[in-house]
Amino acid sequence: SNVIAGVRSAAAELSDSGGSAAASAIMTTDTYAKEAVAHGTGFTVGGMAKGSGMIHPQLATMLAVLTTDYPLEAGEAIEFLRPAVDTSFNAISVDGECSTNDTVILLANGASGVARTPETDEEFAASVRKVCGELAKHIVVDGEGATVLAQIAVRHAMSEPEARAIAERVATSPLVKTALYGHDANWGRIAAAAGSAKFNGGFAHLDPDRLSIAIDDVPVLVDGRPTGDEPPLTNGHCAIEIDLALGDGSANYLTTDLSYDYVKINAEYRT
């Protein structure tokens, strides 16, 4: 009865300007409301999301709702949403932890009346990707206790699935994440994590003598040999590029550091 009453109360407050209020209402440990928008030719895609901890692909405490006035037929939304989710919400991790209630929804009412063509469909797909990407980045930036946003790029892996496995392994490595918190350009931890990425019952291909790593565009390992250079990592952002020199596979991932505050937040949290 409380749920029904709550739904009725919320419905009574529906308005054209209610999006920001809704984005604030769904917050839990978030420190700010997360919204994004993309304007296409005659249509709009907007979105809101919540999430800060227990963020990892497939099952996490994340909610995202996208709305659009682009005309879609029943069942078509997934064709645009799934590819966008695969490169955004399914390519982020704050703590590698999972739950059972993540949701990404795309709602379309067709109110724009735009005449659909292959070109407008592609523009719409790009708009959905943009909104998903911005919301996913907001979630990582606002990760529980996060002080560093890390962008991980894996290049020239044996295949794209292997590149993704390596990127995810590095993104979820506690040793890599604590090194980020300590502003330590520790290529050894990155290489060790990459080399232990599980794939197809074994491990992703990696040749230590061909491995190169750059941190904030500074080469720290080239063909398996350390350069001795050490970027400062002091601006709250870190770009890690891992080049395996084995094939054409590539993948991108967003993650955070692991701080004292993350431990404090989750040690004090009670359900």
Where are these regions (language model features)?
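A structural signal for small-residue-enriched, beta-sheet-centric alpha/beta enzyme cores
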Residues: 1-271
